[in-house]
Amino acid sequence: MNPLILTIILMTVFLGTMIVMASSHWLMIWIGFEMNLLAIIPILMKKYNPRAMEASTKYFLTQATASMLLMMAIIINLMHSGQWTITKVFNPTASIIMTLALAMKLGLTPFHFWVPEVTQGISLTSGLILLTWQKLAPMSILYQISPSINLNILLTMAVLSILVGGWGGLNQTQLRKIMAYSSIAHMGWMAAILVYNPTLTMLNMLIYIMMTLTMFMLFIHSSSTTTLSLSHTWNKAPLITTLILITLLSMGGLPPLSGFMPKWMIIQELTKNSSIILPTLMAIMALLNLYFYMRLTYSTSLTMFPSTNNMKMKWQFETKQITLLPPLIIASSLLLPLTPMLSILD
């Protein structure tokens, strides 16, 4: 793709998200979503092949449907309240439709089916944008309308997302699909705490983006797309493979690592709000996620898949320098000791 065209497209994606996050007018928010959607399609189809085209079409249809639902909710709200401002959604029907539309944009269960399919069909770089940047705009709107959201619907979708995110990843050998199911589970954790403590949702989003960014950058660095190619990376770059496995465990929420912090704080916050059954269920279902991460770690580090790979350890004559990677790896694995500083969230 021409660098100038790519720059314009990326700027439009950035501008669309910024318009959504900065607007207090529903029509401007809708326009921002549409700008973002139309600009992201060429990025998803950057490496043109039938899989990428199919993935882009699925993404477009899902997001366009969600945008139509959002516009319908905006019009219902306008008819009842007579105003376009985002301060409060006055009508319960509008609130429910709006929540469902934004859940579809985020990929919460039961609107999650597009996430693994689209992520698998596109390149690692496009997948990185899809699973990080594209979550910001819908989550910022949910954050702003959190007092008006129907709690039961949101919690049901959250619990189902954590369950599906863990269950779906169990059978996978494709790293992009594993990251997609992980994204669904993380979105579930964010949705569960949104009504009780929206600031904690934003903290969870920040840590999720850092971990996902680290994972995709390591995958791009090592050119890994399957568990088999990941196990072969031991011969080329043992340090990179070790860092991938540590970051994977952090995404699963293993206690000494950064990924445990948001789960711990969310369970603590839910317990403070006299909710016992919900955090217990969430903690049990999070074990599914942790299980497939640990299985991936085990199969990559302690066993080798049957292969005809007889080469010795490769010496790296050409090393790719990625300046951003070391601080991201540190942030993705060693943030847990900073948890006491977050008492400000209370």
From Swiss-Prot:
**Which leading EC class covers this enzyme?**
translocase
Q: Name one GO cellular component term.
A: mitochondrial inner membrane
Which EC number(s) are documented for this chain? 7.1.1.2
Its membrane topology is listed as: Multi-pass membrane protein
User: Mind telling me which InterPro entries this protein's record contains?
Assistant: Complex_I_Subunit_2, NADH_DH_su2_C, NADH_UbQ_OxRdtase_chain2, ND/Mrp_TM
Tell me which stretches of the chain form a coiled coil.
none
State where it is primarily located: mitochondrion
User: What's any GO biological process attached to this entry?
Assistant: mitochondrial respiratory chain complex I assembly
Tell me the keywords, alphabetical order.
Electron transport, Membrane, Mitochondrion, Mitochondrion inner membrane, NAD, Respiratory chain, Translocase, Transmembrane, Transmembrane helix, Transport, Ubiquinone
The record lists the membrane-crossing segments as: 3-23, 25-45, 59-79, 96-116, 122-142, 149-169, 178-198, 200-220, 237-257, 274-294, 322-342
Q: Name one Pfam family in it.
A: Proton_antipo_M
User: Could you tell me where this protein is found in the cell?
Assistant: Mitochondrion inner membrane
Under catalytic activity, the entry for this protein gives:
a ubiquinone + NADH + 5 H(+)(in) = a ubiquinol + NAD(+) + 4 H(+)(out)
Question: What Gene Ontology molecular function terms does this protein carry?
Answer: NADH dehydrogenase (ubiquinone) activity
| Homology family | Belongs to the complex I subunit 2 family.
The role this protein plays is: Core subunit of the mitochondrial membrane respiratory chain NADH dehydrogenase (Complex I) which catalyzes electron transfer from NADH through the respiratory chain, using ubiquinone as an electron acceptor. Essential for the catalytic activity and assembly of complex I.
User: What is annotated about its quaternary structure and interactions?
Assistant: Core subunit of respiratory chain NADH dehydrogenase (Complex I) which is composed of 45 different subunits. Interacts with TMEM242.
Q: What is this protein called?
A: NADH-ubiquinone oxidoreductase chain 2
Q: Which organism is it from?
A: Equus asinus
